[in-house]
Structures are given as structure tokens and as C-alpha cells.
Amino acid sequence: RIGFVVIDEAHHAGLAKGGDRSAYLDMPDILKALGDPVVLATTATATAPVVAELARVLPITSTVVDETVRENLQLEDDRDLASRENRLVSIVATGEKTVIYVNSRDQSVALAKTLRKRVPDCATHIAFYNAGLARSDRRRVEEAFRDGSLSCIVSTSAFGEGVNLPDIRHVVLYHMPFGAIEFNQMSGRAGRDGQPAVIHLLYSSRDARINERLLDCYAPERDELVTLNIVPPVSEWSKINPNL
């Protein structure tokens, strides 16, 4: 009999919806099938609403919040620069380990190619990384970055959870993250060895508009939300607002 279960990156269980990591929605049934073991859920990025949802979905009766502040991290705000690409080139040219986050696989490839041209001395040390790569290829990129063969990775959010490299000196948010949890996951890659590291904000107000359009495109229809029990049907709203 299994008596103790640990769920890492547990914020996903608090964010899970139909079609998006929906396997987490099966956790209550899985735990029941295991005989209701003691559960420890861990995460570094859960917001207060996510913690509340975790307590609802999982058999959690108490929470512990570590208020540790990583004082080795510096935040450099370069949003809305006239040329963020030039600023990015100057960061990559230092040769220090750098992760640049973008919002699409195509952008990861395109920006890596651009940087190889703009920073020729580092061209062979720049790679892209995204979930479209085979697992074996992603592993090779990770190992090359770990041993110093690569100094710069242009990546989607795929380079995040489960990747623990201690000596990343620069994390660049070239495009705007989609939320606080994603921001924390990306920023949290920097300076895990306790040494000074910099988080560079290079996104612009234009990125906010792009994100809004993307969210509008991918947002489920109201009928779908009703089937997922995320919003009540119109009949239920009518009890609150008789004009519906």
C-alpha cells in the first residue's frame, strides 16, 4: 500500500481545466484508488487563488508558505526600448549563460538565427529550444548548456519546469509572459547557485496586445465553459439577474 504521495509543480493541479493538463483533474480518483495516502503538494509559483483551488482538488488541510526572497536577483526594466534587439545582442555578447524566452516556437528559431548573425563570435554557442524538438534533442541542448558548450538558449516556456541549471546569469523576457505563474517560472531559472544574476524585461506594450489577441483566439466558448462546470448555465445566472 502506498502511504505517501508527493505532487511536484502542483500549481498545475490548481490550474487544470478540460483540455489543458486535464489529467490533473483525475488526481482525486487516483488518490482514492491508492487508499487515500498522505499528500504533499509542492510548488514555487502558486498564487493565492491557485492554492485555494489545490486545497479544493486535493486532500490538503494545511499550507506552508516560504517567504524567501532571492536577493541575488536583479530586475532590469528595459521595456519599450527603441531597439530591444540591440540590447539583446549586448547581453548575449557577454558570453555569460543566458536564456531568452519568446512566445512561439517559430520565434525561438528565428531569433536564434538572428543572434548567430549579429553575434558571430558566439554563433556556435547559441541554440533554440522548444517543445517541438524531440526529447533526445532537447536533452542534448540541456547538456550542452550545462557543460558550457552553449552559452545562450532561445526558448519557449518549455525550458522551465524540471530544468535545474545553477549558473544562468541572464534571463531575458523578450516577449511578455502569459501570467504571473509563467513569469515566476521563467525568472526563477536565473541565479540558482546564489550568485548575482539579472532578469531583463525586454517586452513591449505591443506584446501585451499580441497576448490579448492570442488569448481571445484560444479562449473556449461559453458553452464549453458550461460543460466544464466553470460557469453556471444561463438559467442559474437568471436567478441572480432576472434580466437575463
Which residues make up each language-model segment?
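Catalytic P-loop NTPase motifs of RecA-like helicase/translocase cores
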Residues: 11-21, 48-49, 162, 180, ...
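Interdomain hinge/linker at the junction between the two RecA-like core domains of SF2 helicases
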Residues: 30-33, 37-38, 45-93
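Structural recognition of the conserved hydrophobic beta-strand(s) that form the central parallel beta-sheet
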Residues: 4-7, 38-44, 152-155
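C-terminal helicase lobe
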Residues: 95-113, 122-152, 157, 163-244
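Short, conserved loop/helix-junction motifs that constitute active-site signature segments
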Residues: 1-2, 31-35, 92, 188, ...
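SF2 helicase catalytic motif II
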Residues: 1-38
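A short acidic, helix-capping loop that chelates divalent metal ions and anchors anionic groups
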Residues: 12-17, 71-75, 135-136, 209-213
